[in-house]
C-alpha cells in the first residue's frame, strides 16, 4: 500500500519525533517546555545546527512521500514540482511514454485529487514546513544571538517559499482572487491544535500576508546577524530579497517588486553567466557565479545513489536516465523558431537536424548516437563532461541572479517607467545573451510581454514557466508546439484545470478542509499546426 501523506497525522508525527530529541528532555527524561528549549539553544546555538541543515535537505530526498518499495521514481522532492509544472506549460515537450514520469502532467490528468503529482507536492512542501516550524518554535523571535538570528531566518524564509509555492499550485493568482480559498496555515503555534482538530484554508489574502510576514522577519534577521552562510544551500540576504521580489511580482505589486529586485542586486555577489559560460552545457554547479541559491547534491545522497530517481535522470539528455532513453525533454519548435540565430540560447537545444553549435564534438557524437529527437535540450551539462555518465550528482537551481534583472525590467515598466524597463532589458540581453537584441516596446504591457519571452528562454526547464503563465493570466495554447496528440490543448486562462486539487485523503482526514472544484483532464484537440518529431516507442517506466 502506498504511504499517503496527510497534514494532520504528520503534524502529530512531527511532535512525536521532536519529543525524542535532546532538546525535549531534561537529564532525568522530564519533558521540557518551549521556553526551556529556547533557553537551551540560547546557551548553545550549535544544538540547532542539524535542524537547520534538515530544512535545506528537505528540498530533495527520495521516497519521502511514498516508500522505496512503491517505486515512485518521481518522488524526489522539490525538483518534481519543477518538472511537473514545466510539463504543464507550452514550452517543454516530451513523449507520452512509460519513461516519462511526468506524462500525467503533460496530459493534465494530474488534476485529479488522487494524482501522484498532487500527493507529492502537498507532502513535500508541508514536510519542509513542519521541519521549519520545529526550528522556529525553538528560537526566541527576539533573539539577539547572531547564530540564532541566522537559523531563525533560514526557517522563516524557507517556510515562506513553501507557502508561496503552494498558493501558486492550489489557487489562481493573487490579483482578483484575494478572497478565494488559500492554504491551511500550519505554524509552530497551532501544530498541536491542527493535529487534534484539523485546519481550514485561509484566504488568498491571509496566505500572502503570512508569506510576507515571514519574509519581512527573515530579512530583518539577516540584516542584523553577522553570521554568513556556509554555502548556497542556505538563504542569504540577497536571496530573501529575491524571494520577496517574486512574491510581489505575483501580487502585481510592481513597485515593491522593483525595490526588492534592486535590493537583491545591490546585496548579491552573483554575476550573470556570460555568453561564453553558456555556450556549452552548464547549469549543474551551485558554485557557479550566477547562482544565488540552490540544492546541493552529493554522490552520497539517496537521490544520487538511486541512479535514476533524480532531476538529471528526468531532465538530462547527456547523462544516463529516463530522459535519455525515451523521455527526451525538448523545446517547443514554435518557441525555438523565435530564438534569433545571434542568441546563444539557441544552442541550448538541438536544431531540426539534431545538431547544436554549443556541443563539444564528443557530446554531439554521443547524442547523435542516442538518436535524440530534434529540439532536445542540451542546456544541462554533466559531471566532468563525462557524456553518458550515470553519476547524476549535479546541483539544482533555485535562484539565479539573471532573474533579478528580468524582474527589475518588468517591474520598472509596469510601475510606470517604460523606458527604464526597456533599457534594463536591452542592457541585460545584449550583454549576456544576444548582442543584436533590441526591445522597442512603448507600453508597460508590451515590455511585460518582452520580458516574459526572455524568461521563457532564460529559465527553460528551471520550474518557473507555469507559475509565469498563472501570474500573467495566460492560457495554455499548444497548437503547433509539437506535443503528442493526446496532449494538445488550448486551455483558456482561468480554467479550473489550471490549479491542482488537494489530495483526496487529506480532505477526508481533515474535516475543516474544503477542496478546489473537482475537474477532469481536458479533451485533446486536433493540432492544425502539427510538427513532426522522430519518436521512440518505449513500453515501460523501469530502467535496468
Locations of regions flagged by a protein language model:
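Short, surface-exposed recognition loops and adjoining beta-strand edges that mediate ligand/DNA contacts
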Residues: 29-35, 70-81, 170-179, 183, ...
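Sec-dependent bacterial lipoprotein signal peptides
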Residues: 1-18
Amino acid at each position: 500500500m502506498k504511504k499517503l501523506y496527510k497534514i494532520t497525522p504528520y503534524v502529530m508525527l512531527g511532535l512525536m519525533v521532536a519529543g525524542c530529541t535532546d532538546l525535549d528532555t531534561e537529564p532525568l527524561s522530564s519533558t521540557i517546555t518551549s521556553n526551556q528549549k529556547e533557553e537551551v539553544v540560547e546557551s548553545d546555538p550549535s544544538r540547532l545546527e542539524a535542524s537547520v541543515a534538515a530544512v535545506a535537505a528537505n528540498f530533495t530526498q527520495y521516497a519521502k512521500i511514498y516508500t522505496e518499495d512503491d517505486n515512485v521514481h518521481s518522488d524526489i522532492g522539490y525538483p518534481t514540482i519543477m518538472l511537473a509544472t514545466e510539463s504543464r506549460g507550452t514550452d517543454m515537450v516530451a513523449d507520452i511514454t512509460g519513461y516519462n514520469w511526468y506524462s500525467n502532467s503533460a496530459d493534465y490528468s494530474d488534476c485529479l485529487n488522487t494524482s501522484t503529482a498532487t500527493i507529492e507536492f502537498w507532502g513535500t512542501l508541508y514536510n519542509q514546513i513542519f521541519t521549519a516550524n520545529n526550528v522556529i518554535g525553538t528560537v526566541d523571535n527576539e533573539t539577539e544571538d547572531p547564530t540564532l538570528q541566522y537559523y531563525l531566518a533560514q526557517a522563516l524564509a524557507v517556510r515562506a517559499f513553501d507557502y508561496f509555492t503552494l498558493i501558486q499550485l492550489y489557487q489562481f493568482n493573487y490579483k482578483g482572487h484575494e478572497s478565494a480559498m488559500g492554504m491551511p496555515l500550519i505554524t509552530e503555534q497551532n501544530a498541536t491544535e491542527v493535529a487534534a482538530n484539523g485546519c481550514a484554508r485561509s484566504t488568498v489574502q491571509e496566505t500572502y500576508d503570512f508569506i510576507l510576514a515571514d519574509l519581512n522577519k527573515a530579512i530583518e534577521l539577516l540584516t542584523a546577524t553577522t553570521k554568513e552562510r556556509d554555502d548556497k544551500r542556505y538563504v542569504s540576504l540577497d536571496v530573501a530579497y529575491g524571494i520577496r521580489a517574486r512574491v510581489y511580482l505575483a501580487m502585481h505589486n510592481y513597485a515593491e517588486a522593483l525595490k526588492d529586485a534592486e535590493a537583491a542586486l545591490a546585496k548579491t555577489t552573483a554575476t550573470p553567466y556570460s555568453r561564453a559560460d553558456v555556450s556549452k552545457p552548464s547549469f549543474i554547479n551551485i558554485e557557479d557565479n550566477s547562482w544565488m541559491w540552490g540544492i546541493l547534491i552529493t554522490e552520497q545522497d539517496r537521490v544520487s545513489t538511486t541512479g535514476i530517481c533524480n532531476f538529471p535522470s528526468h531532465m538530462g539528455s547527456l547523462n544516463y536516465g529516463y530522459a535519455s532513453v525515451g523521455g527526451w525533454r525538448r523545446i517547443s519548435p514554435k518557441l525555438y523558431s523565435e530564438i534569433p540565430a545571434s542568441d546563444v540560447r539557441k544552442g541550448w537545444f538541438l536544431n531540426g537536424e539534431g545538431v547544436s553549435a554549443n556541443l563539444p564534438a564528443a557530446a554531439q557524437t554521443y547524442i547523435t548516437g542516442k538518436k535524440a529527437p530534434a529540439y532536445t535540450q542540451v542546456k544541462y551539462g554533466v559531471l566532468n563532461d563525462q557524456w553518458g555518465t550515470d553519476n547524476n550528482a549535479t546541483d539544482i537551481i533555485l535562484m539565479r541572479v539573471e532573474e533579478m534583472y528580468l524582474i527589475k525590467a518588468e517591474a520598472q515598466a509596469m510601475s510606470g517607467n517604460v523606458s527604464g524597463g526597456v533599457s534594463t532589458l536591452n542592457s541585460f540581453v545584449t550583454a549576456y545573451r544576444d548582442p543584436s537584441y533590441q526591445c522597442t516596446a512603448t507600453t508597460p504591457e508590451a515590455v511585460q510581454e518582452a520580458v516574459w519571452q526572455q524568461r521563457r528562454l532564460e529559465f527553460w526547464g528551471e520550474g518557473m514557466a507555469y507559475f509565469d503563465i498563472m501570474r500573467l493570466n495566460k492560457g495554455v495554447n499548444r497548437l503547433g508546439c509539437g506535443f503528442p496528440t493526446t496532449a494538445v490543448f488550448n486551455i483558456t486562462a482561468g480554467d479550473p484545470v489550471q490549479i491542482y486539487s488537494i489530495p483526496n485523503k487529506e480532505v477526508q482526514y481533515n474535516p475543516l478542509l474544503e477542496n478546489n472544484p473537482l475537474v477532469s483532464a481536458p479533451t485533446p484537440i486536433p493540432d492544425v499546426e502539427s510538427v513532426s518529431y522522430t519518436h521512440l516507442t518505449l513500453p515501460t517506466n523501469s530502467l535496468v
